[in-house]
From Swiss-Prot:
Entry's family note: Belongs to the alpha-IPM synthase/homocitrate synthase family. LeuA type 1 subfamily.
Protein name as it appears in the record: 2-isopropylmalate synthase
CDD domains per UniProt: DRE_TIM_IPMS (cd07940)
GO molecular function: 2-isopropylmalate synthase activity; acetyl-CoA C-acetyltransferase activity; manganese ion binding
Keyword Transferase: yes
Enzyme class: transferase
Subunit structure, as described in the record: Homodimer.
Subcellular localization: Cytoplasm
Region of interest (Regulatory domain), ranges: 392-516
Name of the encoding gene: leuA
Pfam families, A to Z: HCS_D2, HMGL-like, LeuA_dimer
Pathway(s) it belongs to: Amino-acid biosynthesis; L-leucine biosynthesis; L-leucine from 3-methyl-2-oxobutanoate: step 1/4
Residues covered by the Pyruvate carboxyltransferase domain: 6-268
């Protein structure tokens, strides 16, 4: 590995999924993993294998299917964790074990209730054990941003001696500033005698909005792996945004003088995919991938861009993969055109899924005069997000109007039995403050789950009076947030689909937890 190559370590499937409501099923995680591989991500952190059986299976499956990127699993500094992690990632062509252990006095004393000497011993022993299983082992010094510098350097030196191939310096709580963090990386590079035997990595959180700036400062001072997520998602205020780092290094390559192997024209597709699967919308003014990233309203700016794009644009839409034109399909479009458009949009789907999507496309095309790219993407994401469904919407009728009480009637199929092979149809009606509220109350009567709607948003997927509407929502069940989304030309139907998807996610997670 050349010393001036930046390694992109994507943790969307692990840290990114810790955003409330951002949990994904196995099918969705595979979609993201395949797209990250298409983007050219060097390392995909697929999950935390010991945290749940679902996470273990996801990491194992991704390890078996992705062949171009290294696949990492996160684990604590314990032999049990490391063994479980290895059992999940060992199927990968390029597996990595990622061990973390806190090094700040606050965490050592308050959380772990240990001494510095004990932490140093744990770090060395667990790295050696990890190395006995896997040749690629990463060590993360949790809360390095607030760790004593002398002790941090001592730990870094010791774990490299023990066999760590990458040492990660996280700003776990997003506390440091760019100058501070850059100086910390520079000091590690200067003081640790064996530092050149490992890659120095950084993992910055965005609590003060400085994650990208801190990561860039780290690059200037010798860090060569950046841990990040698509759209910057993650717990609390999120993580370093992969697309912002990638395009900064591309646009300002003469300043940073480093290289990377990402295919930046896949950034837009990757951003859209993650947004749709997690239910976390990208703000319109988000750098690089936001809807307004290449929009110009000022007359002076518009005039300049028309004369020479570089007057007000430092990068082109094509650099990040924004489609130059939207291909319009309709009810007369055939399989070939539809399948080709799906491929052009960056999706790799099996023949059975493609045929199923084509049938859904024809139904939509009968309702809409024109079907745009965003309509097709919405169909794909809705279809691939379903997972195992306990409840399926069969019928919906909702009425409302001036001077009338909104009412709704729904019929839902409920799968029963251990293998969900039997189903019964249930019906309920309810009144509400509006047609969506009435629909949700009718659904609640059937599902018999104490689920609470916490967030609801509706947007038009495409243009025109017959536009496809997309509802994205979050619902809480037994203390956990689940996301749901639904699309339809009927916004009441889209709302019902989104609610039922969140309910199915909650039911699946809770049943798995109970071992059903």
């Amino acid at each position: 590995m050349e010393k001036d190559i930046i390694i992109f370590f994507d943790t969307t499937l692990r840290d990114g999924e810790q955003s409330p409501g951002a949990s994904m099923n196995l099918k969705e995680k595979l979609l993201v993993a395949n797209q990250l591989a298409a983007l050219g991500v060097d390392v995909i952190e697929a999950g935390f294998p010991i945290s749940s059986q679902g996470d273990f299976e996801a990491v194992k499956t991704i390890s078996q299917q992705i062949k171009t990127s290294s696949i990492a699993g996160l684990c604590r500094a314990s032999e049990k964790d490391i063994t479980t992690c290895w059992n999940a990632v060992k199927y990968a062509k390029k597996p990595r074990i990622h061990i973390f252990l806190a090094t700040s006095d606050l965490h050592i004393e308050k959380k772990l209730q240990k001494t510095r000497a004990q932490i140093l011993d744990m770090a060395v022993k667990t790295i050696k054990y990890g190395k006995s299983l896997c040749k690629d082992v990463e060590f993360s010094a949790e809360d390095a941003g607030r760790s004593d510098m002398d002790f941090l350097c001592k730990v870094v030196e010791a774990v490299i001696d023990a066999g760590a191939t990458t040492v990660n310096i996280p700003d776990t709580v997003g506390y440091t500033t760019p100058i501070e963090f850059g100086n910390k990386i520079a000091e590690i590079k200067r003081r640790v005698p064996n530092v050149n035997k490992a890659i120095i990595s950084v993992h910055c959180h965005n609590d003060l909005g400085l994650a990208v700036a801190n990561s860039l400062s780290a690059i200037e001072n010798g860090a060569r792996q950046i841990e990040c997520t698509i759209n910057g998602i993650g717990e609390r205020a999120g993580n370093t945004s992969l697309e912002e780092i990638a395009m900064t290094l591309k646009v300002r390559h003469h300043y940073y003088n480093v290289k990377h192997t990402l295919k930046t024209n896949e950034l837009y597709n990757t951003s859209k995919l993650v947004s749709r699967l997690t239910g976390i919308l990208v703000q319109v003014n988000k750098a690089v991938v936001g809807a307004n990233a290449f929009a110009h309203e000022s007359g002076i700016h518009q005039d300049g861009v028309l004369k020479a794009r570089e007057t007000y644009e430092i990068m082109s839409p094509a650099d990040v993969g924004v489609p130059e034109s939207l291909l319009v399909l309709g009810k007369h479009s055939g399989r070939h055109a539809f399948f080709k458009r799906i491929k052009d949009l960056g999706y790799k789907l099996d023949e059975k899924t493609l045929e199923h999507l084509f049938e859904k496309f024809k139904i939509l095309a009968d309702k809409k005069k024109t079907v745009f790219d965003d309509d097709i993407i919405a169909l794909i994401e809705e279809d691939t997000s379903s997972g195992k469904e306990t409840f399926i919407l069969n019928y919906l009728s909702a009425t409302s109007g001036t001077g009338t009480i909104p009412t709704a009637t729904v019929k839902i199929s409920k799968s029963e039995g251990n293998k969900k092979t039997k189903s019964i149809t249930l019906q309920a009606a309810a009144c509400g403050s509006g047609p969506v509220d009435a629909t949700y109350k009718a659904i609640d009567k059937i599902i018999n789950m104490d689920i609470k709607l916490t967030d609801f948003s509706l947007r038009s997927v495409s243009s025109g009076e017959d536009a496809l509407g997309e509802v994205v929502l979050k619902a809480e069940y037994k203390g956990t947030i689940y996301s749901g989304k639904g699309t339809s030309t009927d916004i009441i139907e889209a709302s019902a689909k989104a609610y039922i998807q969140a309910i199915n996610k909650a039911k699946l997670f809770y049943d798995n937890k109970k071992g059903k």
